[in-house]
A protein has these predicted regions:
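Active-site proximal loops enriched in glycine and acidic residues that flank catalytic Cys/His/Asp
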Residues: 32, 85, 117, 198, ...
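Internal catalytic domains of large membrane-associated glycosyltransferases
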Residues: 1-244, 408, 414-419
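Transmembrane-cytosolic junction motif
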Residues: 301-305, 399-414
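Basic/Trp-rich segment in TM-proximal cytosolic loops or flexible interdomain/linker regions
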Residues: 129-157, 171-179, 204-377
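Alpha-helical membrane-embedded segments
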Residues: 287-294, 381-404
Length: 419
């Protein structure tokens, strides 16, 4: 995107002209926001990125506040806004909106969707097959938890769902200090009150480990930047202090997300300490790293051998990438804390598309992982040779990331016919 001081670019003007001339414009709307200079980053960009775009749309619909550069076919006769990503697939949007209209959900401003990997995105390469079959390397696919909704009246909003325009704007429109929130979905859902639904939104899987890591590290930095919301007092948009109304459960979510930044480092230190203590301790910690995913697949009824195989594979991948993740996660968390203190560059993030094809994560991991394990093996104990051999497997990671589009198999074809 260009960063002209006029607040728009030539490409945006041409896009608006195309929208005005298309015959299908009654089905599609377009808004182009003006850009302003961000005092935190020094760059010309839209106010508060995606969060600001939603707030600007809400204010236009509610109060006819128009600070857009260009708008095409935008009505003010809306009650709800549906939020999806470019790679999202949703088949029951009307039913999702109906959830918010139910009298029992009158206290909620947001209805959240459950995120799941798109079935046919697993055909891209070996990495997507492993990622999709296991529901992902991280806990993203398990965010939809009914226990907290039923017992604690608390749900998570991950950015895909539907919200009531008026209630959402009243509850969070002027609540947050500018240029401080990178990942806004969870914290907005927490303050606006979210109900999780049984409806699924399907998304494309990352097609390489580097793209997956770029997205995961942005999420991690966004979680750490929510650290101020653990305290009893917060700062609002105009800088005045206000009481933090988050529940203990919601604060626990924030704390656990921040704490998860140091899991890889803790496991790596435990692995090294166990190797010093003897082979029994080493293998115990190694098996512990593998155990939770594999046990979950074994205890699932009925037992799915394919799922069990994939659980073993990406549990092994977790160990292979452990040194890199310890370095990357800790570095990202510390960087976010430093930026919080300095109050600078808190809104900088690398998008999913911009990270496409990057090999920097793989290169760093190869150098750091293999060098560390080999050095320990030479200077200290031969048991570290096992670590060195394991970490050498990271050389195969780029092979999992090659773009090899496969044809849909017979199973996928049957699925298409039956849906």
């Amino acid at each position: 995107m260009a960063s002209e001081k006029e607040g728009f670019s030539l490409s945006e003007t041409r896009l608006a002209d195309f929208m005005q001339s298309t015959a299908q414009k009654e089905h599609v709307g377009l808004i182009i926001r003006k850009r302003g200079k961000n005092s935190s980053s020094g760059m010309y960009e839209g106010y508060e990125k995606k969060r600001g775009a939603l707030l600007s749309l809400c204010e236009y619909i509610l109060y006819e506040k128009d600070d857009f550069y260009k708008k095409v076919n935008i009505s003010r006769e809306y009650e709800n806004i549906l939020t999806l990503d470019e790679d999202s697939f949703l088949y029951n949007a009307d039913e999702l909106c109906a959830v918010l209209k139910h009298p029992m959900n009158s206290q909620y401003a947001v209805a959240a969707l459950c995120g799941k990997p798109y079935l046919f995105s697993q055909n891209k390469n070996a990495f997507t097959a492993i990622f999709n079959a296991g529901g992902g390397i991280d806990t993203y696919s398990s965010y939809c938890v009914n226990f907290e909704r039923d017992v604690l009246n608390c749900s998570n909003y991950t950015g895909k769902g539907c919200f009531r325009i008026r209630e959402f704007n009243e509850r969070v429109g002027n609540l947050f200090e500018d240029n401080t929130i990178l990942s806004h979905d969870f914290i907005e859902g927490a303050f606006a009150k979210t109900v999780v639904t049984n409806y699924d939104v399907f998304e494309e899987c990352p097609d390489s480990y580097s793209r997956f890591e770029a997205r995961r590290l942005r999420w991690l930095r966004g979680d750490v930047q929510l650290l101020p919301y653990l305290f009893d007092s917060i700062r609002t948009k105009d800088g005045t202090p206000a009481k933090n109304t988050l529940t203990l459960t919601q604060k626990r979510h924030i704390f656990c997300n921040i704490l998860s930044s140091f899991i890889a480092l803790t496991l790596l230190v435990g692995l090294i300490c166990a190797a010093f203590s003897g082979s029994v301790g080493f293998w115990s910690v190694l098996l512990f790293c593998l155990a939770h995913r594999v046990l979950a697949a074994i205890l699932a009824l009925p037992i799915n051998l394919k799922a069990l195989m994939y659980s073993i594979i990406y549990s092994f991948m977790d160990i292979v990438m452990l040194p890199y993740r310890a370095l990357a996660d800790t570095g990202a968390a510390m960087l976010s804390i430093i930026r919080l203190i300095r109050k600078k560059n808190l809104m900088i993030w690398q998008t999913f598309a911009h990270a496409k094809g990057s090999r920097v994560y793989i290169a760093v991991n190869i150098i750091f992982s293999v060098a560390m394990a080999t050095t320990f093996a030479v200077l200290l104990k031969s048991v570290f040779l096992i670590l060195a051999l394991i970490f050498f497997c990271v050389v195969a990671m780029p092979g999992l990331s090659k773009q090899k589009q496969k044809k849909n198999g017979a199973k996928n074809q049957r699925f298409l016919k039956n849906t």
